[in-house]
Amino acid sequence: MSNMQQKTDVILIGAGIMSATLGSLLKELAPEWEIKVFEKLASAGEESSNEWNNAGTGHSALCELNYTSEKSDGSIDISKAVKVNEQFQLSRQFWAYLVKSKLIRNPQDFIMPLPHMSLVQGEKNVEFLKNRFEALSKNPLFQGMEFSDAPETLKKWLPLIMEGRTSNEPMAATKIDSGTDVNFGALTRMLFDYLQTKNVELNYKHSVENIKRTKNGLWEVKVHDINSGKIEHHTAKFVFIGGGGGSLPLLQKTGIPESKHIGGFPVSGLFMVCKNQKVVEQHHAKVYGKAKVGAPPMSVPHLDTRYIDNKKALLFGPFAGFSPKFLKTGSNLDLIGSVKPNNVLTMLAAGVKEMGLTKYLIQQVMLSHEKRMEELREFIPNAKSEDWDIVVAGQRVQVIKDTDAGGKGTLQFGTEVVSAADGSIAALLGASPGASTAVHVMLEVLEKCFPSRMVEWEGKIKEMIPSYGISLTENPRLFQDLHTSTGRTLGLNEKETVHN
């Protein structure tokens, strides 16, 4: 056991996509800073960032219907869709910068062009999708989107989904070829390989046990070396907690006022994966449906072509599960351990408010394989039970907090940065859209935690991410130029089309 304090400039907790992104930004902006990373598992990108633990969608609101809501007058609010798309463009630009600068190589190993499609059934839903298409088509970020309710066109676009369909219920789809499939596990590992060449100290099998403030204003991180059993103490001027579902318990240990009155509710995801390669080859798109009435946003069903280990795969889901663990590799005591005197009322209020979610989770947990197959057959009528297995994806901890709009114990479905008033520590909480917006979220961390440096750093940030601080919606020519140049660098252009 060692009580010796080891000093550094920056400590990143968790070797996932968020820490990888923040570390990469900091090494470009402040190369002289010493950075240490602590990860409980044996390698990078093994929890939420792992390719089997998330949907791998480059979330840019091209097909996700929950980002466009219908107003009472029937018009479509696209503001959230535009925001998510703008944020994904920042990620795309940063990845292209890293590839162009030869800091990472072989972009085809982490990003592939893939059509993004929305699919709906029923007259009312068809009308909604058409209105959505018309609203989005006016925005330059969504150029190239097509709409069809013609069965012959749908058969061309979606052969696997349309084959064997007997219902006469009207159907419609939108299709845009500029979507992507992103392997965030592969990208995370690439970024940490790059960071290692920049003398970032990567400590795997090191579990962070506690975080506390020292008398001189630094943060002391207590670390358990799992291999040796030793306890280490490291101090830093700045700490980022990017431990996925494990971030909330660590944030609570800091004792900062901003960590109070926040709770977390874990939801696990399950996907069905096709083991018949002949079926896999018949589908080439990410196809998102519409969540059933009363179901939470996380339940939007989608049938996805994926590229994992350079092999084409086909997944359907998500189905929800319940586990009290905050991480896939966590403890069954995580949920109860996160209940504190300062958040117990917030948690109880959420329990009362979210009876619908509780009921939904119970129903999902009770589903048999055949019941899941019935849901899959709404997408693929001819799906055979023997062709599909279930895989358990990652844990997501949905944030519960008190808000002005929602009142006490309101469940949050986004991604949120919580930071100390002095900017010395920050944590990332929440789930979707998550990894896709990693660059936007980590820029937010920089803005919140290093405000005095932002003027000095702005030039370099704009070199890496040219649309930083600029609305691409209001600058369509810039969007066109950046979309073309980043597509060329990332190897996306030959298969995606963006129309002028």
UniProtKB/Swiss-Prot annotation:
It comes from the Bacteria. Pfam families: Mqo. Its cofactor is FAD. It is an enzyme of class 1 (oxidoreductase). Its EC number is 1.1.5.4. Pathway: Carbohydrate metabolism; tricarboxylic acid cycle; oxaloacetate from (S)-malate (quinone route): step 1/1. Keywords: FAD, Flavoprotein, Oxidoreductase, Tricarboxylic acid cycle. Disulfide bonds: none annotated. It catalyses: (S)-malate + a quinone = a quinol + oxaloacetate. GO terms for molecular function: 2-hydroxyglutarate dehydrogenase activity; L-malate dehydrogenase (quinone) activity. Transmembrane segments: none annotated. One of its GO terms (biological process) is tricarboxylic acid cycle. Belongs to the MQO family. This is Probable malate:quinone oxidoreductase. The gene is mqo.
